[in-house]
Amino acid sequence: MEWTDDAIVLSARPHGETAALAVLLTRGHGRHAGLVHGGQSGRMRPVLEPGNRVAARWAARLVEQLGTLALELERATAAGLLEDPLRLAALSSACALVDAALPEREPHPALFDATLALFDALQTEVWAEIYVRWEIGLLEEAGFGLDFGSCAATGITDNDQLAYVSPRTGRAVSLSAGEPYRDRLLALPPFLVGRSAGGAEEVVQGLALTGHFLDRHLFALRHAEVPAARTRFVDRYRKAHTTSGITPAP
């Protein structure tokens, strides 16, 4: 058995004395692991940095075997973010979430393309807003899509009136319908329904929103915790923008 595919490195760890066990997100074969011979060498360690884009060739005698991976670096994504720890933390968070959330060998081509788009966006000024949208897309790919199209209580579709999200169903709730229960609802950042361009306060709201569903509706069902890389990223983002004088909403 053998295939070649475009791929993103999600994680890599030592295996034996010289090899590495790598996990990739591939366009056509989903999340896929394999053994990289010489993966601990000075030549291969930079290739196996999470977030890097690679050309991958996987081979095994039988399809159910772990198999081996031969990788060629196409883009050193992580290296381009070394001077910006916050954006690098976002990259690490995205890789860790995909690695933990997706079943093995189940194709998710739309998520693959969205992840490449996110990594491109990390070079722009709106990267944090796009990151929040990417997490919403990840939830949808995993079967936990959020619905901001109309109010769950009244059916209203006016984006100017949608202000909350039900923590149980993931559906939007209008300002008037949700106001009596606002302490039990999650804030819906205006940028997610086209009412603003975003900003640090709304990004923090968005991360709280997606974090709730990642924790309660995705990882909890698997008796697992949200990856530590995601927690570190959110903590760093909140700290960075609180320190700079922008106090995020609760």
Curated annotation (Swiss-Prot):
Cellular component GO terms, alphabetical: bacterial nucleoid
Pfam family, one: RecO_N
Highest taxon in the source lineage: Bacteria
UniProt GO BP: DNA recombination; double-strand break repair
InterPro entries per UniProt: ARFGAP/RecO, DNA_rep/recomb_RecO_N, NA-bd_OB-fold, RecO, RecO_C
Keywords on record: DNA damage, DNA recombination, DNA repair
Similarity annotation: Belongs to the RecO family.
Function: Involved in DNA repair and RecF pathway recombination.
Protein name (database record): DNA repair protein RecO
Lineage: Bacteria, Pseudomonadati, Pseudomonadota, Alphaproteobacteria, Rhodospirillales
